[in-house]
A protein has these predicted regions:
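Glycine-rich, charge-decorated loop segments at or immediately adjacent to ligand/cofactor-binding or catalytic sites
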Residues: 83-105
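Short acidic catalytic loops
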Residues: 48-57, 83-86
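A short helix->loop->beta-strand "cap" motif at the edges of active sites that frequently abuts
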Residues: 77-81
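Glycine/threonine-rich flexible loop motifs
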Residues: 56-68
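Conserved anion/nucleotide-ligand pocket segment
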Residues: 105-179
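Glycine-rich oxoanion-binding loops at beta->alpha junctions
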Residues: 2-47, 59
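Short, well-ordered, mixed-charge alpha-helical segments that flank or form enzyme active sites
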Residues: 25-27, 58-61, 89-95, 148-152
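Hard-cation-handling environments
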Residues: 180-185
Length: 185
């Protein structure tokens, strides 16, 4: 991926914070003992609501889903509502493949107990995280229109914007889903 840094919006002068710039180790005060990478508390100061609008790729080990999880944990602790803009799963929602993550192997690139190709949208993942992991996040998911579970990205009629420099085409997302299993070997 590419580095995404904090900055200031040129039009409004409002500070912007990258969810990847300063991931911090949440440490032993977390309810669980796993390592939790969350937005820095100072990046949440003066926020009334956090709007999460990122394109996931339908694969357990794509980091936007983990970023969503830890963002949900952070805003829940800070009492900040979260709004997630739901987007199509580029791999569709009918095919679910691969084993579920073993809890003893959790990491930032393998967080939730979902199959490798999970078939969920980011909004559905947010609801799953909130319920399955008891995050207590004040969550609103803005539903999308026109997407059906049988649709792959090319069926959506939407322009493709690469979610990562390493995923330049819809076909690369499908390949990523299978080849990332080799990354840890």
């Amino acid at each position: 991926g590419e580095r995404v840094s904090h900055g200031v919006d040129a039009l409004s002068g409002i500070p912007t914070y990258s969810l990847f710039e300063d991931m911090v180790f949440a440490g032993a005060d977390e309810a669980s003992t796993d390592k939790a990478y969350m937005p820095a508390p100072e990046s949440l100061r003066d926020i009334d609501l956090l709007f999460f609008d990122m394109q996931d790729v339908g694969s357990r080990y794509f980091t936007y889903a983990s970023t969503l999880f830890y963002t949900m944990r952070a805003v829940a602790a800070a009492g900040i509502p979260l709004v997630v803009a739901d987007r199509p799963n580029p791999l569709g929602g009918e095919v679910v493949e691969g084993c579920r993550q073993d809890e003893s192997c959790r990491s930032f690139i393998g967080l939730a107990r979902v199959p490798i190709r999970h078939g969920l949208t980011l909004g559905e993942l947010a609801r799953y995280y909130n319920g399955a992991y008891g995050l207590g996040c004040d969550l609103t998911v803005i539903p999308m229109e026109g997407w059906e579970r049988s649709m792959l990205w090319q069926d959506c009629g939407l322009p493709f914007v690469k979610p990562s420099p390493n995923l330049p085409t819809p076909a690369s997302i499908l390949v990523y889903n299978g080849t990332c299993m080799l990354a840890g070997t």
